[in-house]
Structures are given as structure tokens and as C-alpha cells.
Amino acid sequence: MSREILLLVDALAREKNVSKDIVFGALELALASATKKKISQDTNQDEIDVRVSIDRHTGAYETFRRWTVVEDNDHEFPSRQIAMSDAAEHEVEAVVGTIKEEP
């Protein structure tokens, strides 16, 4: 599918007369949105935070689950937030307000 993504981006950029970066960005957002909906439906979780990154040279893409690091006593949305103490177990420099990502 990697090659198809590159062909799609090239065709859309030429057809709409926009830069490939704009098309890549829109495609990343669309894939992230579809992933959020699918996971939320399949797991009955609140909406999660997801980021998709497409390699501009190969067309390969990665999906990352994301959580915002919050104070331990301010952990209201477990599907989108991670408590500072939990984040610190995985990362030495966990700081409130930063984003923790997992592929």
C-alpha cells in the first residue's frame, strides 16, 4: 500500500494544484480520524488521541496512540491522559503537559 499512497498523493497534488505536504497532512489527519473511530467503537472507550505519520519518500505510515501527561490527581480522561507517576515508569523525563506516544 505504500506505493499506492505515494501515487495518490502525487495525483491529488497535481489535480488540485496544491503542495504534496498539504495532501500528506490531510491524509494523515483522515487516517488518524478513522483509527480513532474504529478503536473507540471496538473498545467502547471514550475518544482516544491518535497521530499518523507518513514517510514522504516511501509511503510507509505509522500510527501512534497518544496521551497527555497530567498530575496524578487530575487524571479525568484515561483514554487520552496518563498520570505523571504512570508516565514516569516509562519515561525518565515525563513532564506535565507533554505528550506520550506509543506505536
Predicted feature locations:
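Charged, low-complexity terminal tails
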Residues: M1-P103
